[in-house]
């Protein structure tokens, strides 16, 4: 139990900014996510490309490969000096490894310079320029820019444009990079918005992350703020960090590069504000603790955090304003214990200052102030209906049960009066859930009523048997009266056995048998009546019909016996035998269709038998025709 004068604070949810209506980051990299991303990048090298993704990706997160010398040796042993891509991966990887120097021959330098041409793809130009920059070799930026611009006009894909941004960041600041910088605005226009929360290219998350990394790298290089709105930066951030598990190294590398760019650039640094700890961490003191960090969960210790205002959700009245947070370790704290706020919900508007690069730096937190409820002035009364007898009142103190029983019948009503107060402040409370439950001790029947406060916040429940007989099914008996108090802001919800009440309904209205209100009792079995089968015809009729059906076959056999069957032309040629067997098989199939198969199955088998029988019959008739012609 909290001591008097204190309240409990529960942090519920981070909502959108109230003052600026700017978007709030919904996805970012927690410390656990950062470690998981590092694990995705820290894989055994399988190629120079995979080494590049691992080494440079880890460096973006402020880490490095476990064995720098081994990584450097791998790069040198796998370097192909005649391949521009290989040189790019080696140059960029060795650049972030301390003490890893790679010597380059004149032939290799000439190869890279030759690749910076209009005839090369944008990807080749990017790799060549970045390799020359990584190896510290001289480069004519104006010529490279001309080749890049000419080639980019032929390759208008998003990937080529992003690679052009990366390329420009390696060129001299003296070069006129305005045309390349203007491509950023065109790329932003090609982004797709999803639900007002996400912004991405249709090519997917990886290219979106590479675009963010390339944009801020180039803008830091030329010293110009990118043409991206703050809301768009947050939408891009939500897209990039929405995925937590990565199957490919390239995707993990792109996310790491974007995270580094968003946490370390000269123009836009998104701020992530999250409550510190769970609700139980702050039960005994009114302290709001916040973690303020970058997208990589790096604490922004240099930030200044202050409360703009706090408003009651119910009344919208301002209860706090212009209060600074204090930095305790890596956590910002606001102690408002002395204010003694009533229990309820409050919207805290918090602003993070200290750097003009901060965006999404005004957030609104929904805070719940909890307290303990106390029950006072509990009176149980029996009131005569014609008021000829003075009411009998008994006062009960929570959590004791009233002694004796109370009677409610056709002559007197039963009434319950009580008040609810805040244990900490003494203020009156009106919780959302205040119920009176009456439980029949014999049948288990339960009836629940809502207790309503009057204009003085005194709760009253009155039981008039003539008005409440429908709720009770006119079931007389002894009922246990429970008082139920509950609310989301209460630390001590109450279920109190207050008293036993004998309720008597007029006997002429009472049912002969009181049924339990248990909804789970077995229901009466339903007896189904099926339609009687139709009478079948006599057996004589069925036999007569069968004989009539078979009579043509019997007549055929009789005529064959009488005049003889002409089988002189029957041959045992394969076509003749197959034809007759096929014909017999089709007759047999008709029988099987009648007894077992459906129409579609029968048609499938009939198609096979019919085809074979047709071909055999055609062959048989052709042979008979040849015989007749010969004779």
Swiss-Prot record:
It comes from the Eukaryota. Glycans are attached at residue 106. It is found in: Endoplasmic reticulum; Endoplasmic reticulum membrane. Pathway: Protein modification; protein glycosylation. Keywords: Endoplasmic reticulum, Glycoprotein, Isopeptide bond, Membrane, Signal, Transmembrane, Transmembrane helix, Ubl conjugation. Residues 562-571, 618-631 are cytoplasmic. GO terms for cellular component: autophagosome membrane; oligosaccharyltransferase complex; oligosaccharyltransferase complex A; oligosaccharyltransferase complex B. InterPro entries: Ribophorin_II_2nd (IPR055375), Ribophorin_II_3rd (IPR055374), Ribophorin_II_C (IPR056790), Ribophorin_II_N (IPR055373), Swp1 (IPR008814). The keyword Glycoprotein applies. GO terms for molecular function: ribosome binding. Residues 23-540, 593-596 are lumenal. It is a multi-pass membrane protein. The keyword Ribonucleoprotein does not apply. Subunit of the oligosaccharyl transferase (OST) complex that catalyzes the initial transfer of a defined glycan (Glc(3)Man(9)GlcNAc(2) in eukaryotes) from the lipid carrier dolichol-pyrophosphate to an asparagine residue within an Asn-X-Ser/Thr consensus motif in nascent polypeptide chains, the first step in protein N-glycosylation. N-glycosylation occurs cotranslationally and the complex associates with the Sec61 complex at the channel-forming translocon complex that mediates protein translocation across the endoplasmic reticulum (ER). All subunits are required for a maximal enzyme activity. Component of the oligosaccharyltransferase (OST) complex. OST exists in two different complex forms which contain common core subunits RPN1, RPN2, OST48, OST4, DAD1 and TMEM258, either STT3A or STT3B as catalytic subunits, and form-specific accessory subunits. STT3A complex assembly occurs through the formation of 3 subcomplexes. Subcomplex 1 contains RPN1 and TMEM258, subcomplex 2 contains the STT3A-specific subunits STT3A, DC2/OSTC, and KCP2 as well as the core subunit OST4, and subcomplex 3 contains RPN2, DAD1, and OST48. This is Dolichyl-diphosphooligosaccharide--protein glycosyltransferase subunit 2. It comes from Rattus norvegicus. The lineage of its organism: Eukaryota, Metazoa, Chordata, Craniata, Vertebrata.
